[in-house]
UniProtKB/Swiss-Prot annotation:
S-nitrosocysteine PTM positions: 152
The species this protein was found in: Oncorhynchus mykiss (Rainbow trout)
A biological-process GO annotation: glycolytic process
Protein name: Glyceraldehyde-3-phosphate dehydrogenase
Keyword Electron transport annotated: no
Binding site for D-glyceraldehyde 3-phosphate: 151-153, 182, 211-212, 234
Binding site for NAD(+): 13-14, 34, 79, 121, 316
Catalyzed chemical reaction(s): D-glyceraldehyde 3-phosphate + phosphate + NAD(+) = (2R)-3-phospho-glyceroyl phosphate + NADH + H(+); S-nitroso-L-cysteinyl-[GAPDH] + L-cysteinyl-[protein] = L-cysteinyl-[GAPDH] + S-nitroso-L-cysteinyl-[protein]
GO function terms (MF aspect): glyceraldehyde-3-phosphate dehydrogenase (NAD+) (phosphorylating) activity; microtubule binding; NAD binding; NADP binding; peptidyl-cysteine S-nitrosylase activity
Length: 335
């Protein structure tokens, strides 16, 4: 068990799975804040999950606290981050998983409540962005209080792009993520004034959408800044997404050599973050997979030694939540 104590703000899809990931990794979660979920409902929501299954341990409530196995977790329902008594609860770090307080200015409100650092579980417009296995060594504990764990798609794409760029060089690349639907979409057609297609029924359609994930790679791998862009298709599956990366390489490499480079990384410096498979897999095979990026060796194609299409799967919920937990541990270690 780590001596790191963590609070979670927002007990939605990512907040609940970050709690699961922290429990698996021995991180002590001491407090949860969500103004829209009372304690009794919190017990129910954590215990039962339609995608990842019932929590295998014991979940209950006692004396106004959430009890998970033998862990007692304080519960708050504050609307404003600065009102949450993180310090009183003993939370050193806070995972900001509401999707609302993304900027340094807004996320810094948690510091007023007694937290020492904040990890935003989404892309931030101005906070330093980290992808485990790619650029976590750039974390500076002396100057970085608010950081971002980037997006689930960037966490899948960046490690793969790093392996390819380090071994063959990327001249330019296009990415498409075929992405599971999320809570921001509509179950049936509804209003979406800014992006009309986003308002169409999520389980009825393949929906072209925008994503900043490819451009964000340039923030974590500066040498690739301006060399990648991409788009998304939202598709009717509840979990697991897949990145398709089409690259023009600087140095020629056969598809066999590319597979070898990714496999070497998956078994070496990126073990746990990048996976490698040659099985004939489909999306549901990766529900609950904790890798950031699972390279599908059998699905990619090579047009020639300088032009390739690479495929990598990711559990956009569970894999990402494990990276949040890993970043917490890494930051604590660096302190």
């Amino acid at each position: 068990m780590s001596d790191l104590c963590v609070g979670i703000n927002g007990f939605g899809r990512i907040g609940r799975l970050v709690l699961r990931a922290c429990l698996q990794k021995g991180i002590k979660v001491v407090a949860i804040n969500d103004p829209f979920i009372d304690l009794q409902y919190m017990v129910y929501m954590f215990k039962y999950d339609s995608t990842h299954g019932r929590y295998k341990g014991e979940v209950s409530m006692e004396d106004g606290k959430l009890i998970v196995d033998d862990h007692s977790i304080s519960v708050f329902q504050c609307m404003k981050p600065h009102e949450i008594p993180w310090g009183k609860a003993g939370a050193d770090y806070v995972v900001e998983s509401t999707g609302v307080f993304l900027s340094i200015d807004k996320a810094s409100s948690h510091i007023q409540g007694g937290a020492k650092r904040v990890v935003v579980s989404a892309p931030s417009p101005d906070a330093p962005m980290f992808v485990m296995g790619v650029n976590e060594d750039k974390f500076d504990p002396s100057s970085m209080t608010i950081v971002s764990n980037a997006s689930c798609t960037t966490n899948c794409l960046a490690p793969l792009a790093k392996v390819i760029h380090d071994n063959f060089g990327i001249e330019e690349a296009l990415m498409t993520t075929v992405h599971a639907y999320t809570a921001t979409q509509k179950t049936v057609d509804g209003p979406s004034a800014k992006a009309w297609r986003d308002g169409r029924g999520a389980h009825q359609n393949i929906i072209p959408a925008s994503t900043g994930a490819a451009k964000a790679v340039g923030k974590v791998i500066p040498e690739l800044n301006g060399k990648l862009t991409g788009m998304a298709f939202r598709v009717p599956v509840a979990d697991v997404s897949v990145v398709e990366l089409t690259c023009r390489l600087s140095r020629p490499g056969s598809y066999a050599e590319i597979k070898g480079a990714v496999k070497k990384a998956a078994e070496g410096p990126m073990k746990g973050y990048v996976g490698y498979t040659e099985y004939s897999v489909v999306s549901s095979d990766f529900i609950g997979d904790t890798h950031s990026s699972m390279f599908d060796a059998g699905a990619g194609i090579s047009f020639n030694d300088n032009f390739v299409k690479l495929i990598s799967w990711y559990d956009n919920e569970f894999g990402y939540s494990h990276r949040v937990a890993d970043l917490l541990l890494y930051m604590h270690f660096k302190e």
